[in-house]
């Protein structure tokens, strides 16, 4: 037991909670609401965390370690209270203490909002990485934005997604600290004036700009049982000059709050819709805002301990998580040139030893490009620096590939009226990594082939991982206790030890226990579904789950088309043997992404028809879980039998949901894509259901443009029937044209859109066959339990602890920090 056993002396803890309720709300404990109790418990826990947080900062000051600044547009942290208690090794003590006074920790945890600081896998990965860094004892700061409303809260109305603000801060958030003493000015617009300083030196002066103040809010990231507390600093924007009373008194109410609105808009939402020019501008401003503030704070911290800025690469590394923070390259150059007075050569030398880039996508549209006009107008000085980086890089290309203008067209940072952010990151970064072995290989051979040929030494792979402390210890306490009972608790900090479970896979008693735990988790999720969806689902049915961002390449459409096919089969052959299935979906679609939103409507329309058809005797149920997020995800992973990881091969960089399901003993139905490939290597062909084309086959079809979905439509009557149901009103009786765009995306070869871009029809039969195998396999409970246990046992490679250790060894070169607590 760590020192928290002493701190969480039950009586002392209850007294502190009671006192906190009294001081904060002027109430007795018995009068307090659950939200008030959550706030009080959180403040008491935060007090414990703050002792370790201060000790960690002291250790940083004393040991002066190299620090990684992990820059990410998203941090999908999930709830903090339960996670902090687990990492303080005090979860059970607190649960028992609260029970003694009639309070339920589960109910209290449910009062905490999910901090709306991210959306998908990118943000959750950043959160897992921060937790692993703290647990492994490495100094790290997460750098992001404190969004007031996140992306959005998803509501389903008449089957359609409706976006409403996610007001996660409405009750205040106990696990954050406002740090106005570390605020920085961020400048937009204006122009750059030059001054000749003599000796051939020119000074660049930025004038006529608008500015906002960036104010950091620090959140503690608690390591597991080691007193280490790292910091997530998320930036809020405030006006440099606040409310203008003079304007207000003159009746000009808009002008009175103009500066406040300018600042407020910057941090209102994650990924503002960029289908229009204002949205594009806002996104670029957001990115520059948090990157500039984070760099200023990092350099100020460095200068507190060091006089020579040339030593910066020995003490700081800036990891750019995807293309959003890559303006950091030019902003760091600006600070070194204009504020530190360095020469171009020295500034470039420092920058190229400080910045590293993680590529997260094979999708070309996600490699950000900004119109030069916008970039130059919003960031005039930064743009000048990008121009010079580009000019020098183009000279390098010409030197290495004389007369090859095609190389310049493909590799230049500035080309065709655009600033290509991934190119900027690759040119300046000393490391460029993909996030699964297959993804990295595709980057080297396809998307970034020219860069790989010119600078192969920069490229490396770091297969993603997840933190077992949240996604097993917290999400699935029944299974976590069972694992510990069989192999000890070493897996909590060294997931490779979970492999010791493998011998139990053939043990009938262990199989029975495993299935019983899965059943209890399914009962828990069934209760959640009944409460939130009003649908009765059978915990004895196969829980077949696909939860992730909604995108065409992730192929939620393939899944629901197959459900439609199964329904047709049951209607045509009512006496066929069929193992009952519950198909569970959860996904947010970007507000401006029409086909993704239409897919959500289709899933809900299919659910409406199937769930209300008494004649099929509950053989199929379809559930769409509203507002999918980390907190409900934890329950879903624990309850799944089948994990759908069905992206078009070559399109998913890695995936991490696949790993969370595997850890919790679900069997994967997937393509050979992303990290599925490495999971397959770990767990073997007997414990996973693989289908569909390989990435090589997909890439070949794309190059040759020889795929014709119409041929499949014409020759496969089952597929033809399912697709016809999209447009004959079967699932949309009031508007038979409702799903026409989905139908056209799969078949309309007359449009400019290359039809069925993601090969849904090409993979359909293979997918249906794999689903049939699953149904057969599930009948043999012993075989299923064996495979499930082996999935958990072989998930050791996929801990974010392993991933982070590889980043440390190969890219960051950080020393361990030892935190001493009296």
Language-model features: locations:
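A conserved ligand/cofactor-binding region detector
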Residues: 1-822
């Amino acid at each position: 037991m760590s020192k928290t056993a002493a701190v969480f002396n039950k009586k002392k803890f209850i007294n502190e909670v009671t006192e906190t309720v009294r001081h904060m709300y002027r109430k007795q404990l018995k009068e307090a609401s659950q939200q008030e109790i959550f706030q009080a418990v959180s403040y008491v826990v935060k007090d414990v965390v703050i002792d370790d947080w201060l000790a960690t900062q002291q250790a940083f000051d004393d040991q002066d370690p190299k620090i990684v600044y992990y820059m990410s547009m998203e941090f999908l942290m999930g709830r903090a209270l339960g996670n902090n208690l687990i990492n303080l090794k005090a979860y059970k003590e607190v649960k028992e203490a609260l029970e003694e006074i009639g309070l339920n920790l589960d109910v209290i945890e449910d009062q905490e909002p999910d901090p709306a600081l991210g959306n998908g896998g990118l943000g959750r990965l950043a959160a897992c990485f921060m937790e692993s860094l703290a647990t492994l004892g490495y100094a790290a700061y997460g750098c992001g934005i404190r969004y007031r409303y996140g992306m959005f809260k998803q509501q389903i109305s008449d089957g359609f997604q409706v976006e409403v603000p996610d007001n996660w801060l409405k009750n205040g958030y106990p696990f954050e600290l406002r740090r106005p003493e570390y605020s920085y000015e961020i400048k937009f617009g204006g122009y750059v004036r030059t001054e000749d300083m003599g000796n051939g030196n020119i000074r660049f002066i930025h004038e006529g700009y608008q500015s906002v103040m960036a104010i950091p809010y620090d959140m503690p990231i608690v390591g597991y049982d080691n007193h280490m507390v790292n910091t997530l600093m998320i930036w809020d924007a405030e006006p440099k000059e606040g409310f203008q009373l003079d304007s207000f008194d003159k009746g000009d109410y808009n002008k009175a709050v103009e500066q406040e609105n300018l600042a407020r808009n910057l941090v209102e939402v994650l990924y503002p819709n960029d289908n229009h020019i204002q949205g594009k501008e806002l996104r670029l401003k957001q990115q520059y805002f948090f990157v500039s503030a984070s760099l200023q704070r990092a350099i100020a911290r460095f200068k507190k301990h060091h006089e020579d800025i040339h030593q910066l690469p020995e003490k700081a590394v800036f990891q750019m998580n995807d293309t959003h923070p890559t303006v950091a390259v030019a902003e760091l150059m600006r600070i070194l040139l204009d504020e530190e007075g360095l020469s171009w050569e020295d500034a470039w030398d420092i920058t190229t030893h400080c910045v590293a880039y993680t590529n997260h996508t094979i999708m070309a549209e996600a490699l950000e490009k900004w119109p030069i006009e916008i970039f130059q107008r919003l960031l005039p000085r930064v743009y000048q620096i990008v121009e010079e980086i580009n000019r020098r890089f183009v000279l390098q290309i010409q030197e290495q590939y004389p007369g090859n203008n095609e190389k310049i067209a493909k590799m230049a940072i500035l080309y065709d009226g655009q600033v290509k952010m991934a190119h900027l990151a690759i040119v300046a970064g000393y490391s460029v990594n993909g996030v699964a072995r297959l993804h990295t290989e595709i980057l080297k051979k396809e998307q970034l082939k020219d860069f790989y040929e010119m600078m192969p030494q920069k490229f490396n792979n770091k297969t993603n991982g997840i933190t077992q402390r949240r996604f097993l210890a917290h999400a699935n306490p029944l299974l976590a206790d069972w694992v510990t009972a069989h192999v000890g608790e070493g897996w909590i900090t060294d997931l490779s030890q979970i492999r010791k479970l493998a011998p139990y896979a053939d043990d009938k008693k262990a199989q029975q226990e495993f299935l019983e735990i899965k059943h209890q988790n399914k009962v828990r999720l069934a209760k959640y579904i009944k409460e939130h969806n009003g649908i009765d689902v059978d915990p004895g049915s196969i829980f077949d789950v696909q939860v992730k961002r909604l995108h065409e390449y992730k192929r939620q459409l393939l899944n629901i088309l197959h459900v439609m096919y199964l329904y047709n089969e049951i209607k045509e052959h009512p006496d066929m043997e069929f193992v009952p299935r519950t198909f569970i979906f959860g996904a947010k679609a970007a507000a401006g992404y029409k086909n993704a939103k239409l897919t959500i409507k289709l899933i809900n329309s299919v659910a409406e028809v199937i769930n209300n058809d008494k004649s099929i005797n509950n053989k199929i149920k379809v559930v769409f879980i509203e507002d999918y997020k980390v907190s409900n995800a934890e329950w879903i992973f624990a309850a799944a039998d089948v994990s759908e990881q069905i992206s078009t091969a070559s399109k998913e960089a890695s995936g991490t949901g696949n790993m969370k399901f595997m850890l919790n003993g679900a069997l994967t139905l997937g393509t050979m894509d992303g990290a599925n490939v490495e999971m397959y290597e770990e767990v073997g062909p007997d414990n996973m259901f693989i289908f569909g084309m390989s990435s090589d086959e997909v890439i070949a079809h794309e190059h040759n443009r020889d795929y014709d979905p119409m041929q499949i439509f014409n020759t496969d009557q089952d597929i033809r029937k399912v697709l016809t149901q999209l447009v004959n009103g079967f699932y949309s009786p009031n508007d038979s044209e409702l799903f026409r765009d989905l139908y056209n995306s799969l078949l309309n070869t007359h449009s400019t859109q290359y039809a069925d871009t993601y090969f849904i029809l090409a993979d359909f039969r293979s997918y249906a066959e794999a689903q049939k195998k699953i149904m057969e396999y599930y009948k043999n409970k012993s075989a299923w339990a064996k495979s499930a246990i082996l999935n958990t046992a072989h998930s050791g490679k996929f801990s974010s602890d392993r991933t982070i250790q590889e980043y440390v060894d190969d890219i960051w070169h950080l020393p361990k920090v030892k935190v001493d607590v009296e």
